[in-house]
Amino acid sequence: MRGHLYMRRWKYLVAFLLLIPGIVSTLRAETSASFSKTPPNFKVAFIGDQGLGENAEAVLNLVRSEGAQAVLHQGDFDYENNPDAWNAQINEILGEDFPYFASVGNHDVEKWNGKDGYQQYLKNRLNRLDVEWDGDYGVKSSLQYKGIFIIQVSPGDLGSFHADYLREQLAKNRSIWRICCWHKNMRLMQVSKKADDTGWDVYEEARKGGAIIATAHDHSYGRTHLMDSFEYQTVASQSNTIVITEGRTFAFFSGLGGKSIYGQELSGPWWAKIYTKTQGAHYGALFGVFNVDGVPNAATFYFKNIKGEVVDRFDVISRVHTGSAVEQHRSSQ
């Protein structure tokens, strides 16, 4: 156990050294500003495919007990076209001012718009938090929260030109941490019964921009290795410490929010972890902890189920917009 702790500290020290100017004097001022926006050990929960009732409530209680400071919900809310009940469930457990960011799923489309629709409830929450966003929220939108750049699109559900929007938004933002969120998948980016719904272009634009890809739709959990190409399923590294760059990233689906659990139908060497009914899965959430111990470009992720079991754990280091010190480090190798 002590050895594992030392190894993790060593990884974070290496990540930190990549950021030190002069190693130190040439870090960009804008990058330093971005660093300061993410509090140390800032925890985000990633969920999807939720529903109403006991299972969904258990996952939200897990989010609360783990000390998550924000939720990213990748679509499919209550499955009953009842925005008021869905919002009330969140408020009852997490509170009406909890940072809860959600993108539209296929089961949310019918009641998405309007003054009593899902989108309006989500906008009201953002307004209470004084969080500004660009675009059509939850459909084709972006926002900055605690130094993390979040893009939410809806390929296969609502709107169009989502890949173009991802490319444009990623090109003009200089955050270390960027997350591209949507609900549906390509068939080979899930392991159950879902079809090719999104097109590869959204995956590839997110990869080129060095963004983590967060999806759901498959009612199970899985994550890829570090990828050079999603379209051709090309693995760049199988290390459990994932080093993100512009052109290399990973994707996951986290759809165990409470509705149901699917069995596994597909597999492939690009998967680092698969957790479905076939593996005896329980409902749960993926948690990402950013700025680990004050190292701005270090994060650690773990998937925990409502039984208290951690079924996946991995570290992530971002080399996206971490400043010229990274280039100095590379040139010295």
Each PLM stretch: what is its role?
Residues 14-22:
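Bacterial N-terminal signal peptides
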